[in-house]
């Protein structure tokens, strides 16, 4: 692979990583602590991730347990969870916060699968846009630097192969997450 395509490969990898991060936050009927990754709590005036102010564990397949390191943080964490869009109501016993995940209904599983496919399609569009940018850049620098038409065509083919590789990776991620969601 030509080194001129490296910046575009990096962008495609970032797109794939972003998709996988989004998928990590989608719950599949099991407790997944990644669902809390984007939540922030006010810790002495500083918005902080829950994982930095509490111990987050999964004691049972459908429960997340949050044990703040300071008792004063229980209310703040509970407030952050209630204000979020994760759709789980926390139970607070004064020292611990528990999030119990209900079983997903068949309808909810199908809705999640649609969302997963939609996000996968958006990632594929982003990868294709990166390919378009790569080809435009190749043509522009090719004219400026006097690169032969054959070499430009070869670079375009490499960009297409790179795109095909990342589209296949996106498809694999979509299939794996859909399978995880739809498995009862």
UniProtKB/Swiss-Prot annotation:
Task: Please state what the protein is called.
Answer: Ribosome-recycling factor
For this protein, the record's Pfam families field holds: RRF
| TM region positions | none
Indicate whether Mitochondrion appears among the record's keywords.
no
Family of the protein in this entry: Belongs to the RRF family.
Per UniProt, the keywords (alphabetical) are:
Cytoplasm, Protein biosynthesis
Q: Which InterPro entries match?
A: Ribosome_recyc_fac, Ribosome_recyc_fac_dom, RRF_sf
Q: Name one GO molecular function term.
A: ribosomal large subunit binding
Gene Ontology terms: biological process: translational termination
Instruction: Briefly state the protein's biological role.
Output: Responsible for the release of ribosomes from messenger RNA at the termination of protein biosynthesis. May increase the efficiency of translation by recycling ribosomes from one round of translation to another.
Q: Is Membrane a UniProt keyword of this protein?
A: no
Gene3D superfamilies from the xrefs?
Answer: 3.30.1360.40, Ribosome-recycling factor
The record's SUPFAM superfamilies line, in alphabetical order, gives: Ribosome recycling factor, RRF
Location of this chain's protein in the cell: Cytoplasm
Q: What is its main location?
A: cytoplasm
């Amino acid at each position: 692979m030509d080194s001129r395509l490296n910046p575009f490969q990096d962008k495609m990898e970032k797109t794939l990583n972003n998709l996988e991060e989004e998928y990590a936050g989608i719950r599949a009927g099991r407790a997944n602590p990644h669902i809390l990754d984007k939540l922030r709590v006010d810790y002495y005036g500083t918005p902080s991730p829950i994982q930095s102010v509490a111990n987050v564990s999964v004691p049972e397949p459908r429960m997340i347990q949050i044990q703040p390191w300071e008792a004063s943080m229980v209310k703040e964490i509970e407030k952050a969870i209630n204000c979020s869009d994760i759709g789980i109501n926390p139970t607070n016993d004064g020292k611990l916060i528990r999030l119990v995940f209900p079983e997903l209904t068949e309808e909810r599983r199908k809705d999640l699968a649609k969302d997963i496919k939609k996000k996968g399609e958006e990632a594929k569009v982003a990868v294709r846009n990166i390919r378009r940018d790569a080809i435009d850049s190749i043509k522009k620098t090719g004219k400026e630097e006097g690169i032969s038409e054959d070499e430009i065509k070869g670079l375009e083919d490499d960009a297409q192969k790179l795109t095909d590789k990342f589209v296949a990776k996106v498809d694999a991620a979509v299939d794996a997450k859909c399978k995880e969601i739809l498995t009862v």
